[in-house]
């Protein structure tokens, strides 16, 4: 049976890629291949940048209140398509239903923030800052921004943290969707178009490191926003800074818990489990180090074991599942190796 080949989204249209390189997309709960995403060619990435640049003058001229109205429409459409978006996140990322729904809801909340763009864009002024001088600060859009998206939050990060505020403030955007979880991004692209976002204001591609470097080096891209691992974040920040671009790189965290002897044991363990096991541990909020006061260490471990054994493991689309699969096989094998190391 032929496998669905995803398109890329540029200038308001979904287009077939001319690439020879494709990424297999899997349902983590079953392992089945559910489609293929293109590794867009350099020409296709340049096409997306050009579309964003061409759309910028007209979009920045749209009054802020009109851009805010479009954000309200996007928010409305997210709610209308909540079930479809949640299923997409669950089936391509592996989050259980409640986690996938939370991912989409966070995208909605980021969009709600963007509806307040008239307030966000307000400047400041100070008359007579010194004799004969007044100071005035304006906030203005800059141009084309690029968002580089991780695999673990296909909805919240690109369409909650990145795109809404960026374009609501009058900028345009090229989103590099995660190559293993791009389907949700394409659903959001449809929503943005239906909401009335003009062609070229938002563009979505999937590509490799080489094409990302094209984005980082391109003079028409004024800023970069990235979420992902620290090694990659450092390289992106260095390359973007060398090209004179604004850049924010949110990298991986190392979270710790310190449990004292007087802690409420059941509630504390429940919090530790939620942090460590939520999203199968594939998030920057995941707890990776827990230090317990010696006086309660044995009781803590017993309670942790008890609560962990009660977690229902199951497929992501089953609304009763509380722990879903690792997103892709490479990380699954790394987790098994770490477990073996711990047992040894």
Spans of features found by a protein language model:
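ALDH superfamily catalytic-core signature
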Residues: 231-344
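Residue-level signal for inorganic ion chemistry
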Residues: 31, 67, 89, 170, ...
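Rossmann-like NAD(P) dinucleotide-binding subdomain of oxidoreductase/dehydrogenase enzymes
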Residues: 79, 123-267
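N-terminal Rossmann-like NAD(P)+-binding subdomain of aldehyde/semialdehyde dehydrogenases
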Residues: 1-133, 327
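General structural feature for long, well-ordered alpha-helical segments within catalytic domains
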Residues: 44, 48, 52, 66, ...
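Short, solvent-exposed beta-strand edge segments and adjacent coil->beta transition regions
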Residues: 32-34, 92, 142-144, 254, ...
